[in-house]
Amino acid sequence: MAILGLGTDIVEIARIEAVIARSGDRLARRVLSDHEWSIWEQHQQPVRFLAKRFAVKEAAAKALGTGIRNGLAFNQFEVYNDELGKPKLRLWGEANLLAERMGVSAIHVTLADERHYACATVIVES
C-alpha cells in the first residue's frame, strides 16, 4: 500500500453557525448526504455535527487532489461511524469514480473538535 493523497481541513464552528443563522439549512442541504441529513435534523449539536462533516469532506476532496470542484460535490462524500465509533467515509458518484481511477483501496479518516474548531485529516491509499 502506498499513500496516494493526504488532506487536512479546519473549520471555525462560529462561521458555520453564522451561515446557518443567515441562510437556514441551505448549507446543510448542500453538504450532507441523505443519511447525514436525517442525523443532523435530530442531533443535539447540529452546528458542530455539520462543521465536522464539512471538514472531513473538504479534507477528502484535498486528499483526492481536486478540492470540491470539477464535478465533485460535498454530498458525494458520506461520513459514518463503524461499530466502535471510528469515522469512516463512503464515496458516491464522481468522487467514487475518481477514487477508482486513482486506484484507492483504503481511506483513513480522523476528526477532532474543540470549543471553536473542527479539524479533519483524510489519507487515501492504494
UniProtKB/Swiss-Prot annotation:
The keyword Lipid biosynthesis applies. Its cofactor is Mg(2+). The keyword Endoplasmic reticulum does not apply. InterPro entries: 4-PPantetheinyl_Trfase_dom, 4-PPantetheinyl_Trfase_dom_sf, ACPS, Ppantetheine-prot_Trfase_dom. GO terms for cellular component: cytoplasm. GO terms for molecular function: holo-[acyl-carrier-protein] synthase activity; magnesium ion binding. Mg(2+) binds at D9, E58. It is an enzyme of class 2 (transferase). One of its GO terms (biological process) is fatty acid biosynthetic process. Gene3D superfamilies: 4'-phosphopantetheinyl transferase domain (3.90.470.20). It comes from the Bacteria. SUPFAM superfamilies: 4'-phosphopantetheinyl transferase (SSF56214). It is found in: Cytoplasm. Disulfide bonds: none annotated. It catalyses: apo-[ACP] + CoA = holo-[ACP] + adenosine 3',5'-bisphosphate + H(+). Its EC number is 2.7.8.7. Keywords: Cytoplasm, Fatty acid biosynthesis, Fatty acid metabolism, Lipid biosynthesis, Lipid metabolism, Magnesium, Metal-binding, Transferase. Transfers the 4'-phosphopantetheine moiety from coenzyme A to a Ser of acyl-carrier-protein. Belongs to the P-Pant transferase superfamily. AcpS family. This is Holo-[acyl-carrier-protein] synthase. It comes from Klebsiella pneumoniae subsp. pneumoniae (strain ATCC 700721 / MGH 78578). The gene is acpS.
